[in-house]
Swiss-Prot record:
<dbReference type="InterPro" id="IPR036188">
    <property type="entry name" value="FAD/NAD-bd_sf"/>
</dbReference>
<comment type="pathway">
    <text>Carbohydrate metabolism; tricarboxylic acid cycle; oxaloacetate from (S)-malate (quinone route): step 1/1.</text>
</comment>
<protein>
    <recommendedName>
        <fullName>Probable malate:quinone oxidoreductase 1</fullName>
        <ecNumber>1.1.5.4</ecNumber>
    </recommendedName>
</protein>
<keyword id="KW-0285">Flavoprotein</keyword>
<keyword id="KW-0274">FAD</keyword>
<keyword id="KW-0816">Tricarboxylic acid cycle</keyword>
<dbReference type="InterPro" id="IPR006231">
    <property type="entry name" value="MQO"/>
</dbReference>
<dbReference type="Pfam" id="PF06039">
    <property type="entry name" value="Mqo"/>
</dbReference>
<dbReference type="GO" id="GO:0047545">
    <property type="term" value="F:2-hydroxyglutarate dehydrogenase activity"/>
</dbReference>
<comment type="similarity">
    <text>Belongs to the MQO family.</text>
</comment>
<keyword id="KW-0560">Oxidoreductase</keyword>
<dbReference type="GO" id="GO:0006099">
    <property type="term" value="P:tricarboxylic acid cycle"/>
</dbReference>
<dbReference type="GO" id="GO:0008924">
    <property type="term" value="F:L-malate dehydrogenase (quinone) activity"/>
</dbReference>
Length: 492
């Protein structure tokens, strides 16, 4: 039996950081809007946003070498790094606003100051990182970045990485104290608690079965209650699909033209997690290395301090795995079911093009635990097998789409899809994802609430003072805003 509910203004599908962010922004900008949220699991932030299902890095390009490209002439293109840092500044400003206005409390439960570092081995890589730092330090967003090859200084930063190191190859480290570790699961839960207090209806254990456009222009969303097995249809003026890996199959159900010729390739991740508290307590940094030649961007190895429920942890990875599931809690049929007549050529083209990714995944799947530990010892020479365990992180669905130039291009980023009339939006892809959630949701609002957005700008600038500016070009504004953000988020 299917029951029909009255019309609502907004439906958010998925209980992760993206829906939580969009819902919070809408309640700030247009409090009268009626919002409903549907989440398949029993509580919010349990898939991609869960603390163990992502790296928890506040992505700001302070340590991620894959955000800067080296040219053949030795110059370094930092445009992507600067853009990502600017996006993360927007997220931090919004979170600080929510703390300031009493909507988020105890910021240390979701964000911690953790230095961000880069680590390279070999003359060519050392030359690259020197050029990278020299270029970035010209920008105010990276003014605190340090570089060292001095053994004692490096040891003071990360003793575990220097002790026992026998190789004669040169190494270099960068260090930036303004880095952060973010528990996106805890942040998501806090945002949804606040939304419930403001009248947003959040329903858990709800599986969205279908999304169809009506002649009236509204959307019908069919939802199954997983406890009662009852099906209910809801009507809404606007629908946002922010369901992690499930966003692609849900987008395909809408039938909009933007859902055609697009596919997804799932990649799972494994990490080594330290079980020795003495070791954990001797490392305080997120240290990113350089991906191997031919390896995809999500393969960048990193040794990470994490904070979970106030307790420090230490992880190393990721090691790639393969599962046809689009969600950690998904079905083994997800990948097969996502192949449609309109995207089969797209998917096959990607398969032919991305043989290097296939080889990389096969090599990763064949790794033994001893081989994973050998990879860890490149970072931490004295690591002992008995101090580490393997954990499975979340699923990431990399977007495959056609472009004007060619078919089947694998995208390693976050992609916003909107219908022509702006009544539906979907978020696909992976990193930098959650770190840039606020800026991405501003993009959704600009594209989907075109008539209202201009009137919202004064409130937006109250929440995010840098909105409409590039902090890169306004050094004094950056320092003023950063002082405020630091104060409310209690980070450096």
């Amino acid at each position: 039996m299917t029951t029909q509910h009255s019309k609502t203004d907004v439906i958010l599908i998925g209980g992760g950081i993206m829906s939580a962010t969009l819902g919070t922004l809408l309640k700030e900008l247009s409090p009268e809007k009626n919002i409903k949220v549907f989440e398949k699991l029993a509580q919010p932030g349990e898939e991609s946003s869960n603390v163990w299902n992502n790296a928890g890095t506040g992505h700001s390009a302070l340590c991620e070498l894959n955000y800067t490209k080296e040219g053949k002439d030795g110059t370094v293109d930092c445009s992507k790094a600067i853009k990502i840092n600017e996006q993360y500044q927007i997220s931090k400003q919004f979170w600080a606003y929510l703390v300031k206005t009493g909507q988020l409390d105890n910021p240390d439960r979701f964000i911690q100051a953790v230095p961000h570092m880069s680590f390279v081995i070999g003359e060519d890589n050392v030359a690259f990182i020197k050029s990278r730092v020299a270029t970035l330090k010209k920008n105010v967003l990276f003014e605190k970045m340090k570089l060292s090859q001095d053994e004692e200084e490096m040891k003071s930063w990360v003793p575990l990485m220097i002790e026992g190191r026998k190789s004669d190859e040169p190494i270099a480290l960068t260090y930036d104290e303004t880095g952060t570790d973010v528990n996106f699961g805890a942040l998501t839960a806090k945002l949804f608690d606040n939304l419930e207090q403001r009248g947003v209806e959040i329903q858990y254990k709800q599986n969205v079965l279908d999304i169809k456009k009506q002649k009236s222009g509204a959307w019908l969303v069919k939802v199954k209650d997983l406890e009662t097995n009852e099906t209910t249809t809801y009507e809404s003026d606007f629908v946002f699909i922010g369901a992690g890996g499930a966003s692609l199959p849900l987008l395909q159900k809408t039938g909009i033209k933007q859902s055609k010729h697009i596919g997804g390739f799932p990649v799972s991740g494994l990490f080594l997690r330290c079980t020795n508290q003495e070791v954990i307590d001797r490392h305080h940094a997120k240290v990113y290395g350089k991906a191997a030649v031919g390896a995809p961007p999500m393969s960048v190895p990193h040794l990470d301090t994490r904070f979970v429920d106030g307790k420090r942890s230490l992880l190393f990875g990721p090691f790639a795995g393969f599962s046809p599931k689009f969600l950690k809690t998904g079905s083994h049929m997800d990948l097969i079911k996502s192949v449609k007549p309109n995207n089969i050529v797209t998917m096959l083209s990607a398969g032919i093009k991305e043989m290097s990714l296939t080889k990389y995944l096969v090599s990763q799947l064949m790794l033994s635990n001893d081989e994973r530990m050998d990879d860890l010892r490149v970072f931490f020479p004295n690591a002992k097998n008995e101090d580490w365990e393997v954990i499975t992180a979340g699923q990431r669905v990399q977007v495959i789409k056609d472009t004007e130039d060619s078919k089947g291009n694998l995208q390693f980023g976050t992609e916003v899809i909107t219908s022509d009339d702006g009544t539906l939006a979907a978020l696909l892809g992976a990193s930098p994802g959650a770190s840039t959630a606020v800026d991405i949701m501003f993009d959704v609002l600009q594209r989907c609430y075109r008539d209202e957005f201009k009137g919202w700008e004064p409130k937006i600038k109250e929440m995010v003072p840098s909105f409409g500016y590039r902090l890169t070009d306004h050094e004094d504004l950056y320092h003023k805003i950063n002082e405020e953000v630091t104060k409310y988020l209690q980070v450096k």
